[in-house]
Amino acid sequence: MAPRRKEKYKLPVPLPEGKILDDMEGNRWALGKMIGSGGFGLIYLAFPTNKPNKDARHVIKLEYQENGPLFSELKFYQRAAKRECIQKWIQQRKLDYLGIPVFYGFGLTDFKGRSYRFMVMERLGIDLQKLLDQNGGFKKLTVLQLGIRMLDVLEYIHENEYVHGDIKAANLLLDFTNPDRVYLADYGLSYRYCPNGNHKQYQEDPRKGHNGTIEFTSLDAHKGVAPSRRSDVEILGYCMLHWLFGKLPWEAKLDDPVAVQTAKTNLLDELPESVLKWAPSGSSCSELVKYLMYVHNLAYDDKPDYQKLKKILNPDGVPLGPLEFSTKVQSVHVRTPAQQKVDSPKATRKPANEFPAKFPKKVHRETRARQREEQEDSQPTMLQSRPAAPENSRTRKIHEYSDIFSEMQSLQQTPSYMSFQGSYCKPYLDCTRRDPIRKPRSLPRYRHTPTGNLGVTDLESSPRFWPAIFQLTLSEETKADVYYYGITIFCLLIFVFLALYFL
């Protein structure tokens, strides 16, 4: 029995993770982590008890049994979206896929004296609203492709006597394993507009007015008329405007449903000038204008010409390619399943500037140490007044080398292997930025200032380097210092080579 319609539905008490649910076909499902909630129900990751998988490929949507939206969605899948029916449609229409989520089962369960209804669905990826929030809008080609994919879905569900009624970016989700596929989800407001082949009659009911998501809902819904096929294609038109420009003409009036209804009426009545005047200068939206003009001329019970609508959105018949959710400012990376593992915290917290190879990591540490040395040379007072930060052994060794060389004041060195021009590890590099990666500056050379009667100015280039050292006339104290530092440097070099070998 269908639950009674209520104005507001109660959000159910969450079920414990690990609870086993039995569907009507005898399949057993283990609840995983709760990943979402809506105005009426909760969404959990789920695992078949006989096939546990770290990458959860199923979700369970549940609500109190007396609630209504999940019941409506369940009836839609049972009547219109069985897997074998979808596959048959794909073959007949020669589609590569159809963007309707796969339905696996349903059932009832009890918890703390309350009865819950649940349904098992395939797991999908990120929704388009999150991508839209990051971008502010999509590329025109992406918007047109999304429209064509949604027309494929709408044609199928309309042929099976249903309308969706709530098309929006939050209800469009990318495939979990293939982000170039998009699915229309959430059929809680789906409506059987043509039961047993008899189309509902046009009848306005102010008590049911402004139903749906106010930004995108159709003029029929504003008037309290039951949704029809033209309602769905009209809603899709508003969505495409929003995806392309990141805004709608009535977005400042959302607190006043009547004002939104008036703005939509004016937009459709004054096409094409209304859209062309409102759209940003230099933008091209002729396809959307033609689409809305066609939709506006549909009668309440007309069947849309889906092929004509797709031809309007793709007049050249270009094959549909990958979906690109990016703008001129940034590019959104849609994660693959390997990056979406729900029970692997390391995968979700991976630093943006982490490099996979060992050698670049070492270069990064050395470059940071070099930058610190340069800052100490240029701002000694600031560094002395600032608390010392913890250093690793590699950094301490570099500081020791600097102290030794400054005390000896007798050697001139060229940059070591740490300063090679091919380095791409700029100090404190933010790898999430799209700025060109700049090469690090070379290490500063230690210049020798001649003092006393020493005649050697470049000991490295001298062919008699070590004989010159032993022929120098030095005091006993200076000789002791030279031997001491020589042994120290030799030992430190051994430690450095050992450290590099085992890193």
Swiss-Prot record:
Catalytic activity: L-seryl-[protein] + ATP = O-phospho-L-seryl-[protein] + ADP + H(+); L-threonyl-[protein] + ATP = O-phospho-L-threonyl-[protein] + ADP + H(+)
Region described as Disordered: 334-353, 362-395
GO terms for MF: ATP binding; protein domain specific binding; protein kinase binding; protein serine kinase activity; protein serine/threonine kinase activity
Tissues with expression: Expressed in liver, kidney and muscle. Weakly expressed in thymus, bone marrow and spleen.
Entry keywords, A to Z: ATP-binding, Cytoplasm, Endoplasmic reticulum, Kinase, Membrane, Mitochondrion, Nucleotide-binding, Nucleus, Phosphoprotein, Serine/threonine-protein kinase, Transferase, Transmembrane, Transmembrane helix
E.C. number(s) listed in UniProt: 2.7.11.1
GO terms, biological process: cellular response to oxidative stress; regulation of interleukin-1-mediated signaling pathway; regulation of MAPK cascade
Phosphothreonine PTM positions: 336
Active site annotation, chain numbering: 166 (proton acceptor)
GO (cellular component) term, any one: endoplasmic reticulum membrane
Region (Interaction with MAP3K7): 392-503
Localization per record: Cytoplasm; Endoplasmic reticulum membrane; Mitochondrion membrane; Nucleus envelope
The record's account of how the chain is modified after translation: Autophosphorylated.
Family per record: Belongs to the protein kinase superfamily. CK1 Ser/Thr protein kinase family. VRK subfamily.
Assembly with partners or alone: Interacts with MAP3K7, MAP2K7, MAP2K1, KSR1, RAN and MAPK8IP1.
Name of protein: Serine/threonine-protein kinase VRK2
Protein source organism: Mus musculus (Mouse)
Lineage of the organism: Eukaryota, Metazoa, Chordata, Craniata, Vertebrata
